[in-house]
Amino acid sequence: MFMNTQNSQATEVSSEEESQKKLEELVALAKEQGFITYEEINEILPMSFDTPEQIDQVLIFLTGMDIQVLNQIDVERQKEKKKEAKELEGLARRTEGTPDDPVRMYLKEMGTVPLLTREEEVEISKRIEKAQVQIERIILRFRYSAKEAISIAHYLISGKERFDKIISEKEVEDKTHFLKLLPKLITLLKEEDTYLENLLLSLKQPDLSKQEAAKLNDSLEKCRIRTQAYLRCFHCRHNVTEDFGEVVFKAYDSFLHLEQQINDLKVRAERNKFAAAKLAAAKRKLYKREVAAGRTLEEFKKDVRMLQRWMDKSQEAKKEMVESNLRLVISIAKKYTNRGLSFLDLIQEGNMGLMKAVEKFEYRRGYKFSTYATWWIRQAVTRAIADQARTIRIPVHMIETINKVLRGAKKLMMETGKEPTPEELAEELGLTPDRVREIYKIAQHPISLQAEVGEGSESSFGDFLEDTAVESPAEATGYSMLKDKMKEVLKTLTDRERFVLIHRFGLLDGKPKTLEEVGSAFNVTRERIRQIEAKALRKMRHPIRSKQLRAFLDLLEEEKTGTSKVKSLKSK
């Protein structure tokens, strides 16, 4: 009996020691990682920890030591966040500039924004959707919306407005059938609007009883409901409905100004008859505007305050969605660097694509927002590169053709190990060699003559181009020396011989003359001039004279070659 008790005590001691060791191991792992997961706690703790109370004590102990206990999903999310933060940090380090460089600051700031889970994306999308429903409901209460809708409907029927820009194609499948129904819808809306105006005018009658007023108000509310139902049948896009809201806000400013005017006139009307007359006119003006809006002043103010509140909620939710996905824009934009746009411009264009994605995202389809937004961001970036990167704009379809040719060239180069010829590339892509050459020529980027050669250089490309219109200093010096030497050699001839050679070869004015022209100057025959010329040339060929001029033959040959090159370039 004594032995059994002793054994059980020893077992308890060893169990406590094991528990202590496991707990120390748990703490060491948590400190090393900065956290501990529930899965790791279950693996490390001994089997003796099998009650909820014991597990709770361990969790309380870890919490007391400021150790976070996380789910495995949270750990994966933290790892993903750290990985992206490191990528952004590396990208920021690679970005040139000073510590206050805008790219560096932007990337650093983006690293602090947390990513959204699928559930959070859905929650934000629901908030946006709810806000949009409320915004539409409030805007459609005003008579302005009916007038704007009728005006747009006429533009659609006449073809002056694009159907897909105004009407939600998600709601309207058959465009032709919808356009046929539009005239009837316009008629119904006009009838309801006229009826609504008559009800509003009737409510302002001074001798109206309470029962009649209640009946008119009931009819007015029903008319408003029918009008809103007809307006929803137009299936306008949300951005079009928000444009109706701009008309409401503009009218609201006018209402407030008129209200202020009436309040000022009320104070002055007690002492001034003219002010009293102005007050009556202002009240009539206010009444007309209330009828035009379909709302009283108090209803108008209440609706606008509510409209502004829902618009703010919508913008806040959209901003949250955009800011949480800015890192996605950066990761896509960095793949399109060195394409003619700066990194900041690429980010800016990508952000515009991201905002469009937020507007058009449909969470009910089940896919993640990042998957959907990627296509909008890519489209915005590639379209910006096509439109802005080149001095001479190339159409988008041509950009796609160029990319196709470049991909084909890269593929052939990897297969053969050499740059493919236009013929090989044409065979691979199913094009003609001439078409491939034409595409290569279009793909070349024009370079500005004022562009700098290297960073911080004061030289430009234009400085390195030869000006063919200006004579080179070397040639000018050579010709000057040739002219002087020619004068010296010609002085060794007789006056008549020198005169004949100068005029026959145009050495004076660059215009050679015929034998007859030179002969008329001497009043001799052309045959006699030919004889004098032949004799003079024989003298010029004498080694004593020709030796002095032979050194200039190279200069003449260079001039001849250069002229032929210029002519060939011009012909091309």
Curated annotation (Swiss-Prot):
Q: Which SUPFAM superfamilies match?
A: Sigma2 domain of RNA polymerase sigma factors (SSF88946), Sigma3 and sigma4 domains of RNA polymerase sigma factors (SSF88659)
One of the entry's Gene Ontology molecular-function terms is:
sigma factor activity
Gene3D superfamilies given for it? RNA Polymerase Primary Sigma Factor, Sigma-70 factor, region 1.1, Winged helix-like DNA-binding domain superfamily/Winged helix DNA-binding domain
* Name the UniProt record assigns to this protein: RNA polymerase sigma factor SigA
Where does this one sit in the cell?
Answer: Cytoplasm
Q: Which family does it belong to?
A: Belongs to the sigma-70 factor family. RpoD/SigA subfamily.
Location of the region described as Sigma-70 factor domain-3 in the Swiss-Prot/TrEMBL record: 400-476
What is one term from the GO cellular component aspect held by the record? cytoplasm
- Tell me a GO biological process for this protein: DNA-templated transcription initiation
Q: Where is this region: Sigma-70 factor domain-2?
A: 321-391
Q: What does this protein do?
A: Sigma factors are initiation factors that promote the attachment of RNA polymerase to specific initiation sites and are then released. This sigma factor is the primary sigma factor during exponential growth.
Primary localization: cytoplasm
Q: Name one Pfam family in it.
A: Sigma70_r1_1
Give the record's subunit note.
Answer: Interacts transiently with the RNA polymerase catalytic core.
Q: Where is this motif: Interaction with polymerase core subunit RpoC?
A: 345-348
The record's DNA-binding region positions are 515-534
